[in-house]
Structures are given as C-alpha cells and as structure tokens.
Amino acid sequence: ERILEAGLAVLKEDGYAGLTTSKVAARSGQNKALIAYHFGSKQGLVAAVAREVSAAITEELLEGIGEPRTVAGVARGVVDGVARIMERDEGLARLYFDLASHSIVEPEVRAIIAEMKQGYRDAVGLVLARVKDGPKRSSDADGAAVYLIACLEGLALEQLERGESPALQRAREMFVRSAPAAVTGVGS
C-alpha cells in the first residue's frame, strides 16, 4: 500500500519518465528490492498504480452518474464527474495523459493504457445499456463508449492546458446536448 501511494505521488510529480524505483523507495520508506519483489519492474509498478487509480476513478464516476435514464443523463454524469475529479486532483489527469503519450512508443505502457481504457469503455457501456434511449446493438454501444470517452479526454486536456473557462463550460454543455444524437444516430 505504501509503495503504491509513493508510486502514485512520484508519477504525479515527476511523470513516467521521472519515475525511478529509488524515488519510490525513498518516498515509501521501503527498499528497492522489496519493490522489485512485489512489482518486478518499473512497468509492473506503473501498471499496479494505474489499476488502482483507474478503479478508483471508475467507481467515483459511476457513483456520480447514479442511475441515469437517458444518454444525456450519462453524458452529464460523466462530464461533471471528470470535472469534479480534476478539480480535486488535477495530477490524476496529468498522469493519465503522460502515460497515454508514452503508450505510443512503449509497448508496456500501451498495454497499461489499453487496460485502463477497456475498463472505462466497459463501465460506460454497461451504463448506456440501461438507459431508455441508449444503443440497441453491442457494436453501437462499443462505439458510443469510445465516442463519450474520446470527448471526455478532449475536454479534460483542454482543462489541463487552459484551465477552467467560460468556453470550456460551454463546450461541456455542447457535449451533453450533442451526445444523444451522436450515440443514437438521430439526425444522421
């Protein structure tokens, strides 16, 4: 537990490139051999931290979404949930995008990000399957989950780059209004 907390703190402060087992050992009060024993490598530690963070974020988002009845309700829940999480701890979003950027060139990190995103898609897909105007086919539900998550990533990146702004608030509202048409294909 202390090692995972230290790993998360170092990742948020120094990023993936700056993470070393020496830094995690110093921060956790554990030795490098213990870290190697439990996690095998830097990538093993990063994967364990990412799983913990991903599970916590997913749980918080699902609690925040509640039991929406419409796609718009799902969109409202996830966009507000991500904004709340970022307001509380912007470092989590920085960590996510840092890992995503490294996933392009590092297969181990790509596997970590793929696992995280699959978990998000599965969770959003389950919520979409329960709403009255949600996708009827599983392939459409998969596409809808990818769409919603991609939009959330863009909004989160905008918040990281420029901070909270009236334009970002309007963009979130546009997302909530447009999500039902995009997900159900209405108007296409």
Predicted regions and their residues:
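Solvent-exposed, amphipathic alpha-helical segments
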Residues: 6-13, 60-64, 95, 99, ...
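Residues in soluble alpha-helical coiled-coils and helical-bundle/repeat scaffolds
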Residues: 29, 40-44, 48, 66-70, ...
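Hydrophobic alpha-helical connector segments
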Residues: 48, 59-92, 141-148
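Amphipathic alpha-helical packing segments from all-alpha helical-bundle domains
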Residues: 58, 88-95, 107-132, 143-146, ...
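C-terminal peripheral helix-coil segments that are non-catalytic and often amphipathic
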Residues: 84, 121-129, 151, 158-188
